[in-house]
C-alpha cells in the first residue's frame, strides 16, 4: 500500500499540504491508500477544516515554545477546538498523561488509551518540572502512585475521582537493558532503540495500526527496518568517533535525552546547542526547567555550549556548578571534539540547530545530502 507522510517533519499547514501534493498525480488524484500526518498542535485548527482524520494520536502535552503557546492550557484549548471540527474522529490517547486523558474525556470524540501500568523507575522524588499538578476537573492537587517522567505516571484526584484509566494497549515486562523489549497483551515487541519515551512511541504505533485494522504480523520486522528521523538517536561514525545527535527542544524532551546519555556509562563529550530563532521560540527561560545538574554524573570529560544562546546555556550550567567551554560555532565545536575528544560524542540541539548540525555531520561522515 502507499502512504502519504510528512516525513521531513514539516508539520504546519504548508508542510501538510506539500506532503499530499508530492503524492498526487498531475490530475490531482492521490496515489495513496493511507495518510499518516504529524500536525503541530496549533496548526490542527487550520488543517482540520480541509480534511477530517479518522484517527488522532495524542501522545502527551508538555510546555513548548512559551512565546508562541504560552501555558499548556492554550495548547489544550486549540486541540479541543480541533476535535470539535472532526466529531467522528477517534482518539488514541496516552493514559499516563493526565492532561491528554482529561482532554479526551472532556470532548465527545470516542477514544482508546495506551500506556504503561507497571512502575519502571523506583525513584519517587524527582526534581523534574511537571505539568498537570492540579486536577483539570476540580482543581485539587493530583496524587501519584508513581511517575514515569514529567507528569506521566499513575495518577488520581483524591477529591473528584478523576484517575488514570486502565489502558487498552498496555506495555508490560519492560526491559531496556538491550534496546527496548516489552509486551502488549500477548504480543512481544523488540526494537533496537534507546530511550524510555520510545516505548510510548511504539505503543502508539501498535495501537493506531490495531485500530485501523492493519495486520501486525510484520510489526517487529518493520520496526527493525525503520530508520528514525534525523536528530532522533541518529548515529554517525566520523574518523573513529561515535557521534549521537538528538533533538531536545523542551524541558521534558531534554530530560529524556539526558537520561539516554546517562545510560551510556563510558567517558563522553557533550555539546549542547541552543538557538532562539522564530521556529525555536525566542523565550529560552525553559532551560531553567531542565535537570541539567544530572550531567554531573554523566561521566562527561567535557561539555561545550554552542549556538545563538550559548551564553544563556553556559550560565544555566554555572548555576549547577558544571563547567563548560564556550564555542558559538557548532562546526568548530564538533571538530575540536573529533580531534581531541573521547571518541564518544553526544550532541543535544534544539530545533533550528538540528538541521545545521545534521548537515555538518553528514558532510564530515561523507554521506550524500
Where are these predicted regions, by residue range?
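Residue-level signal for inorganic ion chemistry
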Residues: 38, 59, 92, 201, ...
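Short amphipathic alpha-helix with an adjacent loop that forms part of the alpha/beta core around
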Residues: 28, 49, 259-263, 292-294, ...
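Phosphate-binding loop of NTP-binding sites
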Residues: 1-115, 123-126, 130-134
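A conserved, hydrophobic alpha-helical segment in the catalytic core
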Residues: 50-60, 152-166, 193-224
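Glycine/aspartate-rich loop-and-adjacent alpha/beta segment that forms the canonical ThDP
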Residues: 347-369
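Gly/charged, well-structured mid-domain segments that form the phosphate/adenylate-handling core
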Residues: 162, 174-177, 208-248
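Active-site beta-alpha connecting loops in nucleotide-dependent enzymes
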Residues: 229, 247-326, 364-369
Amino acid at each position: 500500500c502507499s502512504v502519504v507522510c510528512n516525513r521531513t517533519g514539516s508539520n504546519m499547514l504548508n508542510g501538510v499540504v506539500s506532503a499530499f501534493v508530492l503524492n498526487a498525480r498531475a490530475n490531482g488524484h492521490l496515489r495513496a491508500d493511507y495518510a499518516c500526518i504529524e500536525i503541530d498542535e496549533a496548526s490542527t485548527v487550520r488543517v482540520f477544516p480541509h480534511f477530517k482524520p479518522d484517527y488522532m494520536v495524542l501522545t502527551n502535552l508538555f510546555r513548548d515554545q512559551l512565546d508562541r503557546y504560552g501555558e499548556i492550557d492554550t495548547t489544550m484549548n486549540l486541540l479541543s477546538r480541533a476535535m470539535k471540527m472532526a466529531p467522528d474522529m477517534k482518539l488514541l490517547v496516552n493514559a499516563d498523561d493526565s492532561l491528554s486523558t482529561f482532554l479526551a474525556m472532556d470532548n465527545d470524540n470516542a477514544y482508546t488509551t495506551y500506556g504503561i501500568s507497571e512502575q519502571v523507575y523506583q525513584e519517587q522524588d524527582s526534581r523534574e518540572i511537571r505539568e498537570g499538578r492540579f486536577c483539570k476537573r476540580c482543581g485539587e492537587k493530583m496524587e501519584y502512585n508513581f511517575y514515569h517522567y514529567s507528569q506521566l505516571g499513575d495518577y488520581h484526584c483524591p477529591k473528584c475521582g478523576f484517575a488514570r484509566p486502565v489502558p487498552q494497549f498496555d506495555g508490560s515486562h519492560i526491559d531496556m537493558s538491550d534496546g527496548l523489549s516489552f509486551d502488549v497483551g500477548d504480543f512481544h515487541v523488540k526494537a533496537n532503540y534507546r530511550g524510555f519515551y520510545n516505548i510510548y512511541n511504539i505503543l502508539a504505533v501498535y495501537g493506531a495500526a490495531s485500530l485501523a485494522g492493519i495486520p501486525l504480523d510484520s510489526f517487529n520486522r518493520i520496526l527493525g527496518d525503520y530508520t528514525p528521523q534525523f536528530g532522533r538517536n541518529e548515529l554517525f561514525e566520523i574518523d573513529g568517533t561515535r557521534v549521537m545527535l538528538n533533538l531536545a527542544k523542551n524541558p521534558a524532551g531534554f530530560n529524556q535525552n539526558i537520561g539516554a546519555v546517562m545510560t551510556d556509562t563510558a567517558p563522553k563529550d557533550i555539546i549542547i546547542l541552543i538557538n532562539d530563532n522564530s521556529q525555536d521560540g525566542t523565550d529560552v527561560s525553559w532551560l531553567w526547567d531542565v535537570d541539567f545538574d544530572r550531567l554531573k554524573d554523566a561521566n562527561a570529560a567535557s561539555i561545550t555550549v554552542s549556538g545563538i544562546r550559548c551564553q544563556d546555556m553556559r550560565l544555566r550550567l554555572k548555576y549547577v556548578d558544571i563547567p563548560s567551554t564556550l564555542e558559538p560555532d557548532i562546526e568548530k565545536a564538533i571538530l575540536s571534539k573529533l580531534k581531541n575528544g573521547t571518541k564518544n560524542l553526544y550532541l543535544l540541539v534544539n530545533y533550528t540547530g538540528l538541521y545545521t548540525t545534521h548537515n555538518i555531520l553528514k558532510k564530515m561522515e561523507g554521506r550524500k545530502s
